[in-house]
Amino acid sequence: MVPGVRLMPADVLEKLAPEYPIVADILEYRQLTKLKSTYADGLSGYIASDGKIHTTLNQTITATGRLSSTEPNLQNIPIRIELGKLIRKVFLPEDGDLFVDSDYSQIELRVLAALSGDERMIEAFKNGQDIHRSTASLVFDTPFDEVTDLQRRNAKAVNFGIVYGISAFGLSNDLGISRKEAQGYIDSYFVKYPKIKEFLDQTVLDAKKNGYTKTMFGRIRPIPELNSSNFMQRQFGERVAMNSPIQGTAADIIKIAMIRVHDRLLDEGLKSRLILQVHDELLIETKEAEKDKVIKLLEKEMRGAVDMKVSMEVGTECGYDWYDAH
């Protein structure tokens, strides 16, 4: 960064891009520079003498209970842009092996449905419905088969926003709509999913009373911000209280799944091994001859990690590099 020169944030540039074509070039240049410095150049410094990169998974750094990855952070390989995704092609298994990658589908929304006991959302998951299309149908009062792609995208933002205690202001910024319209989406959501509203409100009340929240498995997260004299800090504390039982329970489930998968691989005498966890995703390096058995084992143990009102769904891909397996 040049002294005395202000750096314009990316979100500001994105708003200017439609009016000034050069802005798109600036954003692309920043993106490419980031990919080169952080990943193309940055990862090469972590290659060990055995030709591999060995990350460190930390158990007690994040407040939510999620594992974090450091030196290097392999949980932060880009996924939103195709060029960033291609970085995964440099991660290869041993010769003759392949990767099996299994990912929980919408785990936090499934946890929300189970914790809240909201019958409508539980039923949607049990029926195998597209939960974002189902929510769009309810929130926008549109027949399920007539929901537009835009309505589904907006409903997806509301679904995930609710998990993080999003405000009308935050949702309006995310969707580029008025604050009044965003509040209407949120209000309609809670009318259609009343048990979710009750659950979130009760969770905040309990957190204020106790000073902490709990996951489904009883793991505690203190929230001192709820007692702050600063209004903004208290608001932040309320959002944390809403989200922590959901994200924390999801973190507990994936850790239980990791233990189950690891133990089963050993019990079955397989040479395949669990090599990485990326939030809701487990990556296994497997022998070609063990592939089918490993896929069945992996999906069974991930689904069986928790018994609740909403079943866990798992998607699995295989490939000869991490990109193809993701």
Language model features: what each stretch is:
Residues 59-144:
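Function-dense linear segments that define catalytic or interfacial modules
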Residues 1-10, 68, 87-95, 110-117, ...:
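Short acidic (Asp/Glu) and glycine-rich catalytic loops that position anionic groups and cofactors
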Residues 281-286:
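Short beta-strand->loop micro-motif that forms the acidic, two-metal-ion catalytic signature
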Residues 18, 54-55, 59-62, 137-270, ...:
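Conserved catalytic core of nucleic-acid polymerases
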Residues 1-82, 92, 98, 108, ...:
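Conserved "right-hand" nucleotidyltransferase catalytic core of DNA-directed polymerases
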Residues 92-95, 267-270, 275-279, 306-309:
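A structural signal for short secondary-structure junctions
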Residues 192-194, 300-308:
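A common structural junction motif
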Residues 305-317:
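Conserved short beta-strand edge segments in small beta-sheet-based binding/regulatory domains
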